[in-house]
Amino acid sequence: MAALSCLLDSVRRDIKKVDRELRQLRCIDELSARCLCDLYMHPYCCCDLHPYPYCLCYSKRSRSCGLCDLYPCCLCDVKLYCLRPSLRSLERKAIRAIEDEKRELAKLRRTTNRILASSCCSSNILGSVNVCGFEPDQVKVRVKDGKVCVSAERENRYDCLGSKKYSYMNICKEFSLPPCVDEKDVTYSYGLGSCVKIESPCYPCTSPCNPCNPCNPCSPCSPCNPCNPCSPCSPCSPCNPCDPCNPCYPCGSRFSCRKMIL
């Protein structure tokens, strides 16, 4: 019974929705069948907005245009003809709204790609390429000689008056890999916003060696015990070329060097 009641509720909602749409269609039909002269223009209006130089009410109805008694001149001259928005103005507003939404969407997509490209310090993303307008199977990624090349190509076909027209779209972006990233470890994925992300399992680093233990070609020895070419001997017992004799029996004492040699 609970399932049947839920089904009946959904059917009632669908019926109400269809009734609303039918009422809207009836209102649109009534407005389109009504004479536009009663609402928008003077019977002798010759402006660019109205295609007829005279009021059509004289040929359709016995009475004259309803605005003739109130306004002796054309309302288009004083910009008062828009008592209610016409279909043409509504179309212009809808087109402007669609264009604004497209610009906002493109701005958000560029911001997202910029954030993804600058987030290499907190993730393993090496780069990102925007491939908007291409399908995932049309995107190709090639890694060779320390470089990543992202390319995409598509063919558009249009049928126009019995003939066919073709147009081609392609994109190609290339960037170099960091020195610490191996070509075999590079992967790519097609994410949200038509963005191809190039990733690696290890974090990219700016220097080829570990920043905590860098390789210094100028000091090949350990920094705690460097090789000093200026003092090859120990500083505690230096070699003195001016005192070749035993420091305990120096020259000039009561024992001469000759006696010591003998």
Swiss-Prot record:
Matches recorded under Gene3D superfamilies: 2.60.40.790
Keywords of the record: Cell projection, Cilium, Cytoplasm, Cytoskeleton, Developmental protein, Differentiation, Flagellum, Phosphoprotein, Repeat, Spermatogenesis
Annotated stretches, region: 2 X 5 AA repeats of [RC]-C-L-C-D: 34-77
UniProt xrefs under Pfam families: HSP20
Subunit structure: Interacts (via leucine zipper motif) with TCP11. Interacts with SPAG4. Interacts with KLC3. Interacts with CCDC42.
Domain notes: The C-terminal contains many C-X-P repeats.
Protein name: Outer dense fiber protein 1
Organism of derivation: Bos taurus
Source species taxonomy: Eukaryota, Metazoa, Chordata, Craniata, Vertebrata
